[in-house]
Amino acid sequence: MGQEQDTPWILSTGHISTQKGEDGQQTPKLEHRNSTRLMGHCQKTMNQVVMPKQIVYWKQWPSLRNPILVSLKTRVLKRWRLFSKHEWTS
């Protein structure tokens, strides 16, 4: 019983029911009162994991030797760092 309280994603029913997503795929459905909040947290975390792939393209900009693009790149990277720091601490 104590283990179920420590890990909110353990299903109290002992089985996993599924739900159909928008794309028609079956996904596990969490049966816990905090499941919506937990899934929201997972989704937010996944979004943060995906973002660094896009930064690769920003790093190529200085090679263009265009001061406007370099300035824009610097501003975007500063905002991204502030945003990601805020997201991880909250």
Swiss-Prot record:
Q: Where is the composition biased (Polar residues)?
A: 14-28
Which Gene Ontology terms of cellular component type are present? host cell cytosol; host cell mitochondrial inner membrane; host cell nucleus; membrane
- Biological processes annotated in GO: symbiont-mediated perturbation of host apoptosis; symbiont-mediated suppression of host cytoplasmic pattern recognition receptor signaling pathway via inhibition of MAVS activity
Q: Which InterPro entries does the protein's record reference? A: Flu_proapoptotic_PB1-F2
UniProt site positions, description: Low pathogenicity:
N66
Keywords assigned: Apoptosis, Host cytoplasm, Host membrane, Host mitochondrion, Host mitochondrion inner membrane, Host nucleus, Host-virus interaction, Inhibition of host innate immune response by virus, Inhibition of host MAVS by virus, Inhibition of host RLR pathway by virus, Membrane, Modulation of host cell apoptosis by virus, Viral immunoevasion
Annotated positions for site Important for pathogenicity, S is highly pathogenic whereas N is low pathogenic? N66
Question: What superkingdom does the record give?
Answer: Viruses
Residue ranges of region Disordered? 1-32
Report residue spans for region: Mitochondrial targeting sequence: 65-87
**Localization of this protein:** Host mitochondrion inner membrane; Host nucleus; Host cytoplasm, Host cytosol
User: Any extra remark in the record?
Assistant: Is not encoded in all strains, and seems to be dispensable for replication.
Subunit structure, briefly? Oligomer. Interacts with human SLC25A6/ANT3 and VDAC1. Interacts with host MAVS.
- Describe the function of this protein: Plays an important role in promoting lung pathology in both primary viral infection and secondary bacterial infection. Promotes alteration of mitochondrial morphology, dissipation of mitochondrial membrane potential, and cell death. Alternatively, inhibits the production of interferon in the infected cell at the level of host mitochondrial antiviral signaling MAVS. Its level of expression differs greatly depending on which cell type is infected, in a manner that is independent of the levels of expression of other viral proteins. Monocytic cells are more affected than epithelial cells.
Q: What protein family does this chain belong to? A: Belongs to the influenza viruses PB1-F2 family.
Its name, as the record gives it, is Protein PB1-F2
Q: Which organism is it from?
A: Influenza A virus (strain A/Wilson-Smith/1933 H1N1) (Influenza A virus (strain A/WS/1933 H1N1))
